[in-house]
Amino acid sequence: MSGLTTHILDQASGKPAAGVGVRVSRRDGEQTQWLAELRTDADGRARLVAGEDLAVGGYRLEFAIGDHFKASGLPVSDPPFLDVVVIDFAVSNLDQHWHVPLLVSPYGYSTYRGS
């Protein structure tokens, strides 16, 4: 089953990052097509693109993480060091599921190709 999903984990609290705004777009050369703008669920997860709407090519995820940390009550800089985390990646096989987790704190992040 193909498709594109994400899961955001707040490394500062050790909990899923619920309610984070995520935008997803497909990039084709100079053209950008916005596909979705949504928020993560209570478990920090979001289904971004259904399998039938996924295409081979470049994608961009934009995570509005600054708002999450401002609302968390953690001491963060103003403006936040990380406001929007942008991840550019490519889908190469439509027979696979594409999962892009984000592990994030107010001052750093990492990602990887999940399953």
Curated annotation (Swiss-Prot):
GO terms for biological process: purine nucleobase metabolic process. Residues 1-23 are annotated as: Disordered. GO terms for molecular function: hydroxyisourate hydrolase activity. Its EC number is 3.5.2.17. The keyword Transmembrane does not apply. Gene3D superfamilies: Transthyretin/hydroxyisourate hydrolase domain. InterPro entries: Hydroxyisourate_hydrolase, Thyroxine_BS, Transthyretin/HIU_hydrolase, Transthyretin/HIU_hydrolase_d, Transthyretin/HIU_hydrolase_sf, Transthyretin_CS. It catalyses: 5-hydroxyisourate + H2O = 5-hydroxy-2-oxo-4-ureido-2,5-dihydro-1H-imidazole-5-carboxylate + H(+). Substrate binds at H7, R45, Y112. Catalyzes the hydrolysis of 5-hydroxyisourate (HIU) to 2-oxo-4-hydroxy-4-carboxy-5-ureidoimidazoline (OHCU). PANTHER family: 5-HYDROXYISOURATE HYDROLASE, URICASE AND TRANSTHYRETIN-RELATED. Homotetramer. HIU hydrolysis also occurs spontaneously, but more slowly. This is 5-hydroxyisourate hydrolase. It comes from Caulobacter vibrioides (strain ATCC 19089 / CIP 103742 / CB 15).
